[in-house]
Amino acid sequence: MANILQRLPIGEKVGIAFSGGLDTSAALHWMRAKGAVPYAYTANLGQPDESDYEEIPRKAMAYGAEKARLVECRSQLVAEGLAALQCGAFHVSTAGQTYFNTTPLGRAVTGTMLVAAMREDDVNIWGDGSTFKGNDIERFYRYGLLTNPNLRVYKPWLDQQFIDELGGRTEMAEYLIASGFEYKMSVEKAYSTDSNILGATHEAKDLEFLNKGMHIVHPIMGVAFWRDEVKIEKETVTIRFEEGYPVSINGREFGSALELFTEANVIGGRHGLGMSDQIENRIIEAKSRGIYEAPGLALLFIAYERLVTGIHNEDTIEQYRINGKKLGRLLYQGRWLDPQSLMLRESAQRWVAKAVTGEVTVELRRGNDYSIMDTSSANLTYKPERLTMEKGQEYFSPLDRIGQLTMRNLDIIDTRDKLSIYVSAGLLRGSSTTGVPQLPSGSDE
């Protein structure tokens, strides 16, 4: 059956994810004026650019909502963020700078918790501000239907009547003023911003042009570390993990993961840690560009990965990274709760994260410039005495190594024979100088 409504359902309850901004304010009032019964739901995700959450439901009621609710989502969002960290569920990176999937994590929490709140009010139609070109329209669709199998979706931005009447920001502002509301359009930024406690995303408008860099962005979770006038003092931070979870910062324990994460954001933000510029593939395979902030996740991830590499063996680390990239892409696609994701999550959280106990000390400087100063854990398999160049207890002898190297002769002989086959087939050319077959250079073809 079709779950997407192309026209406003007159006389029916319609839930809307309400931010209090121009778009959702105009949409809510328009739906009420056209005969629908709008219910407004606002997620408290710890958005750093939101000063008064309690005011948002009051705005919704003023614009015509039948009911307006503020849904507390911060603790759940932090829990999902830490799960992603434990799994390394981050697939977008450029030259070692990571995007921490903060928006996809926010959508997983919003899409499930708001729809669950709607069900409590017997609201089975919902809408939000996502456009047909982006990722969120699919993420919300998936999470919404997973939470409520009877859900129908109405999005004003897919309704041609709404588009014809209120197709732009100017038209929406004029509509609210004509309806008797005082509304003053804010100064248009050169880009759009979406944020939650895990991180911020800046994209669109001027940032669609690759000759516009990070420097046009005004960070909302940290400092503009690239500006010479911004003074940043280096800082040493010690983070402790127990069984994969961060439990203290600089020896201070917190009453909840939310409190700890809030402190990690403050510390990382002082340095502009975790900002990155990424080109990525959207779900529909078209490329987009974003500038990202995630100071707390970046700080915790440095410490977590340091412990992972010191505790686990190479094959485990390799599998953790491969699975993390797979899981990161699934998360990005709105599949965080799908069976294949749960399988990958359970594997990493049980067999990788559970062993991650210890402390890491990091010196933070400007931006993503940092040094790891100390690492300690009872679970470390890094033991310098095993490979020390100084005299001491021998874990293996020269004769042991001779035997090990002799066994390598078997695959070396096989490799040499294969190279000869490739020379005969014309895939490689023989070398009179090195004796080792070489790939042909471009000039040889």
Curated annotation (Swiss-Prot):
CDD domains: ASS. GO terms for cellular component: cytoplasm. SUPFAM superfamilies: Adenine nucleotide alpha hydrolases-like (SSF52402), Argininosuccinate synthetase, C-terminal domain (SSF69864). One of its GO terms (biological process) is L-arginine biosynthetic process. The keyword Disulfide bond does not apply. Disulfide bonds: none annotated. It is an enzyme of class 6 (ligase). Pathway: Amino-acid biosynthesis; L-arginine biosynthesis; L-arginine from L-ornithine and carbamoyl phosphate: step 2/3. It comes from the Bacteria. Keywords: Amino-acid biosynthesis, Arginine biosynthesis, ATP-binding, Cytoplasm, Ligase, Nucleotide-binding. This is Argininosuccinate synthase. It comes from Gemmatimonas aurantiaca (strain DSM 14586 / JCM 11422 / NBRC 100505 / T-27).
